[in-house]
């Protein structure tokens, strides 16, 4: 939930200079007199401070006025709004700062003699956070730039390789198709005239030789008796 109430004021109160044996019940009894509470949180490491959150910012302001400098949990506490000063518009004059008290403790480290905005631990945390944020931002920018460059290089290197491989495949397939079609046409459909003539001659020659061998030999004239005719010799004249 928001730390600001419906009237726009601060609802969380800082309680400083608490003893090590401060209890949650004592704080609730002391601050609930001014209004209903939301949460009560007591620091343990380092100890010495607490935060009390009200439901209404006006109750928080009343608690600051009534309990600041009072003895709670066996020690004189310092009570103020968690921002250190009440919320104001930009046209209001900044209120006068509270005079420094050497007995006040810092709620960041628990030591006396300074406040949280002057704490060396708080300054270190702010520096480490700013450095980590700047480092992460620069790292993210470098990573995004290197990634975009690598993508551009990959796309450039991949496109000529793909185009070359595709052109080589197409040329090879076209040459194979041409060679196959040429061999089929030459073997089946397109024969040279010299081959056809030689085949026709080789086929016709044995037929002529067979016809000659089968043709009957010249017939000899025979007599009806079967013996060859002889010319009659002239009869002798006795």
Swiss-Prot record:
One of its GO terms (molecular function) is zinc ion binding. Residues 11-84 form the RRM domain. Keywords: Acetylation, Cytoplasm, Isopeptide bond, Metal-binding, mRNA processing, mRNA splicing, mRNA transport, Nucleus, Phosphoprotein, Repeat, Repressor, RNA-binding, Transport, Ubl conjugation, Zinc, Zinc-finger. Extensively phosphorylated on serine residues in the RS domain. Pfam families: RRM_1. The modification N6-acetyllysine is found at residue 24. Residues 81-98 are annotated as: Sufficient for interaction with NXF1. GO terms for cellular component: cytoplasm; extracellular exosome; nuclear speck; nucleoplasm; nucleus. A zinc finger (CCHC-type) spans 104-120. Brain, liver, kidney and lung. Disulfide bonds: none annotated. Required for pre-mRNA splicing. Can also modulate alternative splicing in vitro. Represses the splicing of MAPT/Tau exon 10. May function as export adapter involved in mRNA nuclear export such as of histone H2A. Binds mRNA which is thought to be transferred to the NXF1-NXT1 heterodimer for export (TAP/NXF1 pathway); enhances NXF1-NXT1 RNA-binding activity. RNA-binding is semi-sequence specific. This is Serine/arginine-rich splicing factor 7. It comes from Homo sapiens.
